[in-house]
């Protein structure tokens, strides 16, 4: 074997050992993470002040902290909004927020209760070491005093309560060190603003469009985290979001709204100017169709088919929210505070469906995922978690606050921006079927079920609005399979029980729904078919139509906007 081959073999063994020992990827890739940390003024100030707090933070008659953490969020963002063909807002902003958590007691019982959950502060942007450390010092002192008061209040309350199966207040975690590159926001806003202006001119194409607005938000978010256990983490991620929304009114006064968004990890994943305008035109056309659509029938109980896009909303609301392992309030005996609290090792979905949450994935079948991260906001490495296996609930997503039967974190403790406490959160929630059907087979199954029950039509839902209210819903006629758009529908019984008992098939297709919100995450789901759901007419108030028409728009202006650009 040559010297070069020997060297390569040694390198291979070293990398293998680092990974098998759970060594942080950031550390394995960096020759000297400490040098990188010292070169970062924010991280250096956090580490220096943390060491000072560990040795000097002690009040008379109050125990010293057993745990301290500092978390800083640096958010550089640009936002813009256009309406009626003109830019209405154009703002570049940047802020740094600090959150300090000081825990008194021990891992079994500590002060993390009400005001003891942490102290917040605004951090300076100029990287002055003394200014940074001063804000850290102020927040740490305040957090320590609040922790002392909270521990007393908590112990007093516990004397009046009985908990059958108490669990620890905090989970231990191995220290990690990972220094990733900082994210930066560097772009020319002018072409993006022109895209917003062009899309918002679509109000001219339809006098009955009350408004058509477009907006964007680009963010570069850098996270810093250190704790007294030895964890030092810096990560950076950029997010890019573009939206448009149109509003109109049906002849009977019903308010109609449609929106569409594009969310990406990189600017290159956003649509081109032509694609963005084309999507906006499609949405405006859908609003015109919705105005002419008839109202949904007052009563229907039967099969309903949901597109992959619509099913992402169902699984986000009925599964995603309920697999989060939030610890119950003090004195409560439940496993969690959500609907699946008593469903551990019980069936929550049909046996052909399984669900995982895998924040380590960057893509799913070549589609980018927004919920990827390496280390969560509590300093724990992200892990893939099998949440539902063959319909059976097997896990909850948890952070470092244990719940019954789950004493340690599985890397899902994340914090809302800018400075909320960390808690269980989704990463990339992925639903799969062991018995997938083609789109044609799913529609045929819908029609067959309707025929068996002498129903003239079934329903197909393509998208949702808020609170699981369908926004695009179609009658699928048994006679010839054609689809007819209707409006004004709500579901009477779309809940966790119907998800468990009435969901009978899933497709081989899928949709990826990327959500930015305050905690970026992704939902991946197939189309799904329920054998029976109640669909009824919404009892919503209707506003009167405008008393007189909008200002006239010249035919030439309409033609200019309608022409492909």
Predicted regions and their residues:
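N-terminal secretory signal peptides that target proteins for export/translocation
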Residues: 1-7
